[in-house]
Amino acid sequence: MSATNKQNAASVFGRPWIFIRGVPSMKFLPPEGPTEIAFAGRSNVGKSSLINALVGHKGLARTSNTPGRTQELNYFVPDGYSGEAGDLPPMALVDMPGYGYAQAPKEQVDAWTKLVFDYLRGRSTLKRVYVLIDARHGIKKNDEDVLALLDKAAVSYQIVLTKTDKIKAAGVPRLVAETLEKIKKRPAAFPEVLSTSSEKGEGIEDLRAAIELAVTR
């Protein structure tokens, strides 16, 4: 990623960001407008914390130690745009409900799953999905199911390892290489794996630049 790319990303993510809408079902989705970048992952993988780190606002996306807390598609955009034609924000970040939380009531899990899958399959303004993988656990069966769905729907996605501060630093490059090997034959996977720590701020600048590049391509 070029210096210009990183400067553009810093400009976008350096603005104040705001929460605009929680979407409990597809009928409540906002009108299609700005490019959407979504974050998917197992419950408690750190989606909300990563979004907060990206925009430099610890309290923007609500975080919780309780798995399954995010139950809607939560939309965030940079402030200062009217949202009208000709004055749309450059992108919207979408915090998706976590999957794989077995302790939630079945009806709730089914509703979350339907919302996530319907959104991934049917949103034309969705440019890329960042699938977050806990560095301590690697890719699980639930993750593979989501990757297969994204492959089938031809939705571009990129793997982001989270919580890398929780493993030995020397093990991060090896984990990145192993993860890349697992996804290299998947048709919709972007051929680069990013590593991040929201707590330490590691990898955040690279992720911002990757998002900016995905939006502007």
UniProtKB/Swiss-Prot annotation:
GO terms for biological process: division septum assembly. SUPFAM superfamilies: P-loop containing nucleoside triphosphate hydrolases. One of its GO terms (cellular component) is cytosol. The keyword Magnesium applies. Keywords: Cell cycle, Cell division, GTP-binding, Magnesium, Metal-binding, Nucleotide-binding, Septation. It holds the Pfam family MMR_HSR1. This is Probable GTP-binding protein EngB. The lineage of its organism: Bacteria, Pseudomonadati, Pseudomonadota, Alphaproteobacteria, Hyphomicrobiales.
